[in-house]
Design a protein with these regions (language model features):
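C-terminal, non-catalytic "cap/extension" segments appended to globular domains
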Residues: 43-157
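Acidic/histidine-rich catalytic neighborhood
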Residues: 1-41
Length: 157
């Protein structure tokens, strides 16, 4: 989340609270999808299926610090390990935002050149993976540091 954009385009006296809440929600989703991926890897590893309700509840409850009922162990699944795609997208989102800020400044969102970069990057739809998109920008593939820094900065504010 770009704090400058939020401050410029959002009204109200509780912007810091909003940024903190949004960041905590994102952190929750990151932890949830990482836990889902871990569980799905275990589920599809060919192990004992009778252990999976307990594994599901244990993994998600540990990751999120709230109890998850065992009954959802087959409902809370995405096809083809799609949880991994979400995680990669969130990682790349932070990388891309960082790239645009480094290239155009803190108000990168305000420049037409930013839109041109984004149009060029995404004009082919889903032809490219996030790794290929990062490579096209000259970035390291799936670098977690921008995401860590964004979360840390937003929670310290």
């Amino acid at each position: 989340m770009n704090e400058n954009w939020v401050s410029e385009y959002t009204q109200g006296s509780r912007l810091e609270e909003y940024i903190r809440f949004s960041t905590l929600k994102k952190l929750y989703m990151l932890r949830r999808y990482a836990a889902k991926l871990l569980y799905e890897l275990q589920l599809h590893s060919g192990g004992d299926l009778s252990r999976m309700p307990r594994e599901y509840a244990s993994i998600l409850s540990y990751a999120l610090k709230i109890r998850h009922p065992e009954v959802y162990y087959l409902d809370d699944l995405d096809d083809c390990f799609y949880a991994a795609q979400y995680l990669k997208a969130w990682i790349f989102e932070a990388q891309l935002r960082n790239f645009l800020i480094q290239r155009f400044g803190e108000r990168a969102y305000a420049y037409p050149e930013t839109g041109e970069v984004l149009k060029e990057l995404f004009s082919r739809g889903q032809e490219y993976s996030v790794e290929e998109l990062a490579e096209r920008l000259g970035l390291a593939a799936l670098d977690l540091d921008p995401l860590y820094e964004e979360i840390d900065n937003n929670l310290r504010a």
